[in-house]
């Protein structure tokens, strides 16, 4: 079943309101095994709304609209649906009673224009609105189904979940299963190139989502039986792992700190942090994981040179000669925090997050990561970021976690 979602309202086109309804509906429909091929937005203009609906009924089996069901003059959805389906609007006495009852319950006066909401296209089924006055519309035609819901997210969601979702599940008896693979250390474009021949797969379908310094691959299969779907997904996962498995750090509901915590526990080792430009963000992400006290010794936020020297043992001459942002300083920070907190592994970051503080030699976004391993050997990594201050700090944590993850994953026998 192919679906189109239409959001109605001039305020959406002007950017006054963000359209969260479409994202919600797309996620729910996809979860039911329905293919959302189109999402449209149209203003409160009868002619343009009619054309949008006309296009939708020609290319989709299921059309869901949000907005335009209220009592005012710019609420035009009923009229447009009536015209496109050639079903005249008919007053429903039962809806008149419901609308009057709503205002009586609120002890407020009902203006006459509210009765506009009691009109539905002939043959349509009203969708109960338990939190508002505007009922939804469900109209089945020979080749398509139109469902209209209010634009207010609270009303739309409760009506969809209580009335529309059960109806759709009954109509579209497909099971859908998804699996997510999480990647670090490889960009979206490179990953797509390596998987190019399978990215166009229809069932299971593959979708890449990049952001926050990592990439997700969502594999979605649908069918009548769970076993067949899972087998198809497993074949894709096997292919992906054979090609780019070294960059996969986890599956489904997980995070990089979570997987690092599992590896630290599995290896039976502890870690300590020395953070400069991230200001404790790495430690915060580690301690977000329940049970992290088993492997996290603690950290030093060494923002000033004095703290680097006095609390981490960084040589004053190193800072004077090489600078606070240098591979030498990062190495001494990692080694120092490992020794002073008596941890097996020391991880450090020092850099220029911005927006000020950069030079031609050391620009904003320059970061060094230091990693002191269980044998005391220290490695450093140079990074250059181009974001704003917050993005640079976040990407620094991601990169530090990446090097730590690879060390824990591949340096132990």
Curated annotation (Swiss-Prot):
Pfam family membership, one: CinA_KH
Gene3D superfamilies xref list: 3.30.70.2860, CinA-like (3.90.950.20), MoaB/Mog-like domain (3.40.980.10)
InterPro entries per record: CinA (IPR050101), CinA-like_C (IPR036653), CinA_C (IPR008136), CinA_KH (IPR041424), Competence-induced_CinA (IPR008135), MoaB/Mog-like_dom_sf (IPR036425), MoaB/Mog_dom (IPR001453)
Top-level division of the source organism's lineage: Bacteria
Similarity annotation: Belongs to the CinA family.
Name of the featured protein: Putative competence-damage inducible protein
């Amino acid at each position: 079943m192919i679906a189109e979602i239409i959001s109605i309202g001039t305020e959406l086109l002007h950017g006054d309101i963000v359209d969260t309804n479409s994202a919600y509906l797309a996620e729910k429909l996809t979860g039911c095994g329905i293919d959302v091929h189109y999402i449209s937005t149209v203003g409160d203009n009868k002619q343009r709304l009619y054309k949008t609906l006309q296009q939708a009924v020609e290319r989709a089996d299921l059309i869901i609209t949000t907005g335009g069901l209220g009592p005012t003059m710019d609420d035009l959805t009923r009229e447009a649906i009536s015209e496109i389906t050639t079903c005249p609007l008919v007053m429903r006495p039962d809806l008149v009673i419901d609308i009057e009852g709503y205002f009586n319950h609120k002890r407020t006066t009902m203006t006459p224009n509210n009765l506009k909401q009691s009109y539905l296209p002939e043959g349509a089924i009203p969708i109960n609105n338990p939190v508002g006055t505007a009922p939804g519309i469900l109209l089945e035609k020979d080749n398509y189904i139109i469902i209209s819901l209010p634009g207010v997210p609270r009303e739309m969601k409760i009506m969809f979940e209580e009335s529309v979702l059960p109806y759709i599940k009954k109509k579209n008896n497909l099971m859908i299963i998804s699996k997510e693979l999480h990647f670090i250390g490889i960009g979206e474009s490179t990953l797509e190139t390596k998987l190019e021949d399978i990215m166009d797969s229809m069932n299971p379908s593959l979708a890449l989502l990049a952001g926050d310094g990592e990439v997700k691959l969502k594999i979605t299969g649908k069918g009548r039986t769970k076993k067949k779907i899972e087998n198809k997904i497993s074949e894709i996962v096997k292919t992906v792992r054979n090609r780019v498995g070294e960059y996969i750090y986890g599956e489904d509901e997980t995070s990089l700190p979570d997987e690092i915590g599992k590896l630290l526990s599995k290896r039976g080792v502890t870690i300590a942090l020395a953070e400069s430009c991230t200001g404790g963000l790495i430690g915060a992400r580690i301690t977000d994981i329940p049970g992290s006290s088993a492997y996290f010794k603690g950290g030093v936020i060494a923002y000033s040179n004095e703290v680097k020297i006095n609390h981490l043992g960084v040589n004053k001459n190193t800072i004077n000669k090489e600078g606070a942002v240098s591979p030498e300083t990062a190495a001494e920070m990692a080694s120092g925090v490992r020794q002073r907190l008596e941890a097996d592994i020391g991880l450090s970051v020092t850099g220029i997050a911005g927006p000020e503080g950069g030079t031609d030699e050391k620009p904003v976004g320059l970061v060094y990561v230091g990693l002191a391993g269980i044998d005391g050997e220290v490695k450093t990594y140079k990074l250059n970021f181009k974001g704003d201050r917050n993005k640079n700090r976040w990407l620094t944590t991601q990169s530090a976690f990446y090097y730590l993850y690879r060390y824990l994953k591949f340096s132990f026998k």
